[in-house]
From Swiss-Prot:
One of its GO terms (biological process) is positive regulation of transcription by RNA polymerase II. Its main location: cytoplasm. Keywords: Activator, Cytoplasm, DNA-binding, Metal-binding, Nucleus, Repeat, Repressor, Transcription, Transcription regulation, Zinc, Zinc-finger. This is pH-response transcription factor pacC/RIM101. It comes from Aspergillus niger.
Length: 667
């Protein structure tokens, strides 16, 4: 009956300080009377409610009844504290103690608990289990916990993964953005891309967040606070800087490559030197490695809006444009022409490489190289019908006449088709000819972009040491009389002789024998040959005459597979070199077509009246002189203009012919 006594004494204590407020005393007196009547009817229910209120305090850790005290249940202690904080401090200081005061107790004696720890921090954390103190509050649902580890376990119950990557700092981010919230303004969420998106007006979505960010949530969700999302700005300013640095490295490497060409730093007729020099350009971002030849002054493209939002009324922010300086090694038209000639020599060297020509007879890798939008043939077989003239994929006309174009009926092929039954040694191989006798592939503009193999006359083939059997081969049609429709695949590093089809027939005919003894011996030979039959199917490119036992056949098969892989890698490298050379030639040709070069000759006519027209010639410019390519400066052959007569000005120099004796005479 202590509860009714407490409630009845409450009015007397509250009415004492306010004797004059009689109008407010009657309601305060009626309320305790109603509570006392209710508790008198159900005393047990009231006690249960009071105990529940003590066991489950509110989230801030305070109780609903300030006058209620919390008892310490430590063994032998009857202390009462007014708040959970005071109770926790009492247990830690009085019962746990400290090592410095020589009263440290690492065993919990709260009620029947006898938990023992090894450190004071551990037992003080354990005391929170018994004390109704919940200082750790969940930022998402507001639920409070006693220990930090309990809060961590609770956070994991939130299903959304974006909760786990949320920054715990207060005010760092809006929690609604974690769950991909719907149509909210997000006007204040400008923390990720503030430096890059200052010019974009902050506007909210009227139709919800874009589907792009809902279906593909990134580890750090992209900022949906703007109606327009631009690719050029989502990456921040670092992406544009990295792109500029990458393009500048490729641009400088290309300029250095052109400078090495001018100074003849490597031999363009050596396949190894050409491949080693091109290797440094293949891994760089060149200004020409795109759909077509582009100028080096290439600004960044305009940003494209994604995510369903159109451009804002204020307009998209202008993308930062960068400009690269002009190449110092390709400034004049003469530089471009001579570098194109160097590239043509390198292209001829790649096409006439011994390894690639000998890989599959006449079916060299260049035979399946097609320009068609920089696409290549997927098979190694040569085309069924070859046009009368072929050309590699170049965009500029050839700089010199090429004697390789011919009629299909005027000579024999310089390289015998691989279907011939004879093999060549190193001394009699078609590719062992001197480099001077080779003919570079022609370069013509036209619809057909197949490179044509060189041809040789009967006298040339006989003088070069070709067998007489090759003189009966057809013209450069790559074996056109053998199988026009179903072409065989010519791979590198393997024999080209087909498997005889009569072996299985001979095994079937061995079933009929003349004598019994021979019939008994025959199946024994078949037993040894039967296990190798599945392997012979997979090793169809190996000559059956070279196969022996099963172990030898397996070793030969592995060797052939390794050789095929090496040949495929070499073919891929060859195609990359050809592609890079074609890009470089397209780049030079495009600059010649657009006129992107310095005209140093334009000032010669204006200064001729001063008698210095000969100083403006291309040969006098230090930038236009090409070592090893240009002939000597024709200073003796070309003389400056004659002195003008009275009243007549001659604007053009007069040339004098030079005879064999060195005496010059006027024409």
């Amino acid at each position: 009956m202590s509860e009714p006594q407490d409630t009845t004494t409450a009015p007397s204590t509250t009415a004492a300080p306010m004797p004059t407020s009689t109008s407010q005393d009657s309601p305060s007196a009626q309320q305790p009377a109603q509570v006392s009547s209710a508790t008198a009817a159900s005393a047990a229910a009231t006690a249960a409610a009071a105990s529940a209120a003590v066991a489950n305090p509110p989230m801030n850790g305070t109780t609903t009844r300030p006058s209620e005290e919390l008892s310490c249940l430590w063994q032998g202690c009857s202390e009462k504290c007014p708040s959970p904080e005071a109770l926790y401090e009492h247990v830690c200081e009085r019962h746990v103690g400290r090592k410095s005061t020589n009263n440290l107790n690492l065993t919990c004696q709260w009620g029947s608990c006898r938990t023992t720890t090894v450190k004071r921090d551990h037992i003080t954390s354990h005391i929170r289990v018994h004390v109704p103190l919940k200082p750790h509050k969940c930022d998402f649902c507001g639920k409070a916990f006693k220990r930090p580890q309990d809060l961590k376990k609770h956070v994991k119950t939130h299903a959304d993964d974006s909760v786990l990557v949320r920054s715990p700092e207060p005010g760092a981010r809006n929690p609604d953005m974690m769950f991909g919230g719907g149509a909210k303004g997000y006007a204040t969420a400008a923390h990720y891309f503030e430096p890059a998106l200052n010019a974009v007006p902050s506007q909210g979505y009227a139709h919800g967040a874009p589907q792009y960010y809902q279906s593909h949530p990134p580890p750090q969700p992209a900022n949906p606070s703007y109606g327009n999302v631009y690719y050029a700005l989502n990456h921040g300013p670092e992406a544009g800087h990295a792109s500029y640095e990458s393009k500048k490295r490729g641009y400088d490497a290309l300029n250095e490559f052109f400078g090495d060409l001018k100074r003849r730093q490597f031999d363009p007729n050596s396949y190894a030197a050409v491949g080693q020099r091109l290797l440094g350009l293949q891994s760089l971002s060149l200004p020409v490695l795109s759909s077509g030849p582009l100028p080096e002054y290439q600004p960044m493209p305009a940003p494209v809006a994604v995510g369903g939002g159109g451009y804002s009324p204020g307009g998209a922010p202008s993308a930062p444009a960068y400009h690269l300086p002009p190449m110092s090694n390709v400034r004049t038209k003469n530089d471009l022409i001579n570098i194109d000639q160097f590239l043509q020599q390198m292209q001829d060297t790649i096409y006439e490489n011994d390894d690639n020509v000998a890989a599959a007879g006449v079916a060299q890798p260049g035979a399946h190289y097609v320009h068609g939008g920089m696409s290549y043939r997927t098979t190694h077989s040569p085309p069924t019908q070859l046009p009368p003239s072929h050309a590699t994929a170049t965009s500029s006309a050839s700089m010199m006449p090429n004697p390789a174009t011919h009629s299909p009926s005027t000579g024999t092929p310089a390289l015998t088709p691989p279907s011939s039954a004879q093999s060549y040694t190193s001394g009699r191989s078609p590719v062992s000819l001197p480099s001077a006798t080779r003919v570079s592939p022609p370069h013509h503009e036209g619809g057909s972009m197949y490179p044509r193999l060189p041809s040789a006359t009967m006298a040339d083939s006989m003088a070069a040491g070709y067998p007489t059997a090759s003189s009966t081969a057809p013209p450069s049609t790559l074996g056109g009389i053998f199988d026009h429709d179903d072409r065989r695949r010519y791979t590198g590093g393997t024999l080209q002789r087909a498997r005889p089809e009569t072996r299985q027939l001979s095994e079937e005919m061995d079933l009929t024998q003349d004598s019994k003894d021979e019939g008994e011996r025959t199946p024994k030979a078949k037993e040894h040959s039967s296990p190798s039959s599945p392997e012979r199917i997979s090793a169809s490119l190996i000559d059956p005459a070279l196969s022996g036992t099963a172990a030898e056949a397996e070793a030969t098969l592995r060797t052939a597979q390794a050789a095929t892989e090496v040949a495929e890698r070499a073919d891929v490298q060859w195609v990359e070199k050809v592609r890079l050379i074609e890009y470089l030639r397209n780049y030079i040709a495009s600059r010649l077509e657009r006129g992107e070069f310095e005209n140093n000759e334009s000032g010669g006519g204006n200064s001729s009246s001063n008698g210095s027209s000969h100083e403006q010639t291309p040969e006098a410019s230090p930038d236009t002189h090409m070592e090893g390519v240009e002939s000597e400066v024709p200073s003796k052959a070309e003389e400056p203009a004659v002195k003008p007569e009275a009243g007549d000005v001659v604007m053009y120099p007069t040339l004098r012919a030079v005879d064999e004796d060195g005496d010059s005479k006027m024409p």
